[in-house]
Every structure is written in structure tokens, then in C-alpha cells.
Amino acid sequence: MKVFVTGVCGQLGHDVMNELSKRGYEGIGTDIAPEYAGVQDGTAVTKAPYVSLDITDKQAVTKIITDIHPDVIVHCAAWTAVDMAEDDDKVEKVRAINAGGTQNIADVAKAIDAKMVYISTDYVFDGQGTEPWDPDCKDYKPMNVYGQTKLEGELAVANTLSKYFIVRIAWVFGKNGKNFIKTMLKVGKNHDEVRVVNDQIGTPTYTFDLARLLVDMIETDKYGYYHATNEGGYISWYDFTKEIYKDAGYTTKVIPVTTEEYGLSKAARPFNSRLDKSKLAENGFTPLPSWQDAVKRYIDELDMENL
């Protein structure tokens, strides 16, 4: 199986490429950088075939993917800077990447009859209430530019293809890039106490674990919408931080505050990021391990001196 992976200089793309290699599949990576610019950790992705590609360039997308002719496209590339996406001078670019780029990829996937995986987010919903979001819920109500453009990407895939997996995730962390765990470890190292919000609820997603599930998925034709965070229950960012510091051996005090007390961010954030993952097991997929286990494994692998 030949698999074309976008966004390999990011957290998830890096891990998907390594998982493909582990299983003996042919992975070809792409990102906008002239050459692979992710962490040089000696893993398979650092030596794998790589092509530079701007996904907003329809002509280039069509030519490169048609020439490679993969069986599957795993589309991890996206604009993910949620607050910066709100800037008036960025909205057009964010839409060009998250919606336009995704449409370009979906069009060529259809032309070559490839399966497509599109990574999405709980931000396509309004983030209110306490009920976990069902993967097949169509009550979309994005609360910011990032969520709106990721929803437009979802619709591009679903309206163009029949052989697709739309996989929503939340609170992502991985080896190859910035994330909440790395940020909190840096902050905790230099402060006696930190304030963290306790009224935004969800579950983290470890890209190493998610990559395994995504490759499991592309081995099947069980297409559709899925939610795929780690198991272990729903938590707040405050709970998450306490677990991070416990595993890292930090004594930093964590003080719970409300979103209102913490202060507004430029983009509105969801209070309810609970994602219902029951469809995974219903379709024969192995769910991800618990987030507690994932955090421990992740911190054990981190170079704490160079976060």
C-alpha cells in the first residue's frame, strides 16, 4: 500500500510516517518546507521520500499526487494557530489552507480513486453543554475562524468523495512540535505556581497512539466520521496539568481558575470538547490507550532539557 501523507513536519504527520514504515507500507511525505524540517530523531520519517508541496496550489497538488498515485492520502496538514487565525489579514490564508487545500486534495483523490483521511477537530461544534459530541452529529456551529475553516474542509471531503475517513481529535500532543505539555513543562520549571482553566472539558490525543489507529483504519473500508482521542475519561486543562507535573516530578502548584478569570483569548474556546468515541469499537477498531498512560509514555521520552 502506497500512502501520501501531508503535514509530515508536524506532530501527527511525523508519527503516521513512522507507523507506515513499521508496518512495511510505502509512505511518501509532504509539507511546505523545501525539505523535511521536523525533528531529526533518526526515525523512519527523517529518511523517507519527501516532496515539497503547497496544498493551496491546485495545479501542483494535482500533478504531484497524480504522478505518485497513492492508494491512500492521509491529510494532516492544516493551519492550527487558533488565535492568529482571527487576525483580519490571516483569515483568507487560513481558509485557503484548511478549506481550499483540502478541496484540492479531495479532487485529486477522487480522480485517482484513492482513499482519504481528513483530520478534523471538535471546534466544528459550538463547544456548549456537557453531552459528548457524536461523530455523526451534523449540528455544526463553529465558534471561531479555525473551526469554521476546518468544517469547510470536512464538507469538501464528504461532498467530493465516498471513500473517506473524517477523524476528529482534540488537545493534541506529540514529539514533533509545540503542544500544551511542552508549554506547561517550560512554565512549571520556572514558576512556583501556575493558573490553569478548569471549566473547559475534553480528552488529550497522543499522536503516536492516533497514528496506529489511522493506519488500522486505512487497512479497511469502514468509511465515515470518527472521534479518536485517548481513553481514560473527560478532564479539564487543570486536571491535565496536574498529571503532567506529577509524571515529570514537578512540585509546581496548579491553581484552578475559570476561563473568565483566566482572561479572554482572541479566539473563543469550547467549554465542551467531549468526543464520543464508541463508534471505533463498534466498527472493530481498537481504541487508543488511556490519556494517563499516554502522558506518562510521552514524558518518559521527552528530552526535558530541550523542550
Regions found by a protein language model. Give the residues of each.
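N-terminal Rossmann NAD(P)H-binding glycine-rich loop of SDR-like oxidoreductase domains
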Residues: 1-23
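Catalytic helix-loop patch of NAD(P)-dependent Rossmann-fold dehydrogenases
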Residues: 92-104, 124-167, 172
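Mid/C-terminal beta-alpha module of Rossmann-like enzyme folds, strongest
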Residues: 190, 213, 220-265, 271-272, ...
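Conserved glycine-rich Rossmann-like NAD(P)H-binding loop of the short-chain dehydrogenase/reductase
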Residues: 25-37
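NAD(P)H-binding glycine-rich loop region in Rossmannoid oxidoreductase-like domains
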Residues: 55-97
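NAD(P)-dependent short-chain dehydrogenase/reductase
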Residues: 155-202, 208-209, 216
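Amphipathic terminal alpha-helices
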Residues: 291-307
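Rossmann-fold cofactor-recognition segment
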Residues: 43-57
